[in-house]
């Protein structure tokens, strides 16, 4: 994501008229606390200042545009306002285990995503090891760690299993209210507006 997409934890999220497939993704966000390069997973925790929530808003049709056989991850995720984060940074000393936190997302009070950060494909420390193997991470850099099943683009519901009630994809519309919460961190809430 581009830094210009960062939004406050209660800011409105713009749904451009150019997208029909605006999606939500609750994610644990890591905030880097000191410069690191080629850091092992075993030492990665020493470089995390703290944790936040990120709603990794995505325009799925933009991601698939011109690339039907793969997903484009930059412009489809970097529109202005599409990176609400917060509600504050909880320091790493305050989170005993970042891989044991409940994580949920609601759209209009309907539970859409529900999981635990222990279900991540790559844990926080492995992600820092991988990223720092190729680039220097600087204080203030934010790493979003991936989302659980149940996004609007996913055929699976909050349980992670096929949702028989769900008829296809479910995307965001103006007026929708998206609430993302992570245990021990807090809650962010964003209203979708047409822009």
Where are these regions (language model features)?
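Short helix/loop capping segments that flank catalytic or ligand/cofactor-binding pockets
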Residues: 9, 39-41, 61-63
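Extended, compositionally biased flexible segments
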Residues: 1-17
């Amino acid at each position: 994501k581009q830094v210009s997409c960062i939004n406050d934890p209660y800011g409105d999220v713009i749904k451009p008229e150019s997208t029909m497939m605006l999606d939500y993704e609750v994610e644990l966000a890591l905030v880097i606390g000191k410069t690191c390069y080629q850091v092992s997973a075993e030492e990665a925790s020493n470089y995390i200042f703290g944790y936040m929530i990120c709603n990794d808003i995505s325009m799925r049709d933009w991601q698939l545009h011109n690339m039907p056989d793969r997903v484009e991850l930059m412009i489809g995720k970097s529109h202005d306002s599409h990176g609400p984060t917060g509600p504050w940074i909880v320091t790493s000393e305050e989170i005993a285990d970042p891989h044991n936190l409940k994580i949920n997302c609601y759209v209009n009070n309907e539970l859409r995503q529900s999981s635990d950060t222990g279900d991540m494909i790559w844990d926080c420390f492995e992600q820092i090891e991988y990223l720092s193997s190729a680039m220097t991470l600087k204080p203030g850099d934010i790493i979003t760690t991936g989302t659980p099943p149940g996004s609007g683009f996913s055929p699976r519901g909050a349980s992670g299993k096929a949702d028989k009630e769900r008829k296809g994809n479910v995307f965001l519309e103006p007026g929708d209210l998206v609430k993302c919460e992570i245990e021990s961190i807090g809650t962010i809430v964003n209203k979708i507006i047409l822009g």
